[in-house]
Amino acid sequence: MELFITKNSPYARLIRVLIHELEIQDRVKVTLAKTRTKNSPYYAINPSGRVPYLICDDGTGLEDSDLICEYLCAVYGSELWTFPGGNDEWESRRLHGVCRSFLDGLSVWLREIARPSDERSLTVIAHEQ
């Protein structure tokens, strides 16, 4: 399998941590993708240009960190990425949603501060801090 990432993507970091926890580093090649550049060769691999993106052993491409985490856990027989049943399920899902929202804001903030200073939106930066 091959996982395409960018260095600063919190979503890619999440999957890299899971790969470590599952002890499958030797089964997943991690490749830095060049995103947000015109004519990047990465667009031939994933037309949306988003990361993380996993190419499975059968050639299927998976986009979305939750989907990739669920897939890896299913393939390697782990319950690390499953919600508990019963009364705890909705609280776990609620906390998962809060964490996803935090990661969304972090992604926007990181992308904004990476821009040249004359192109940054101070409003966006202030909102996401």
Give the predicted meaning of each segment:
Residues 123-129:
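Amphipathic alpha-helical packing segments from all-alpha helical-bundle domains
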Residues 1-121:
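GST-like domain detector, emphasizing the conserved glutathione-binding G-site
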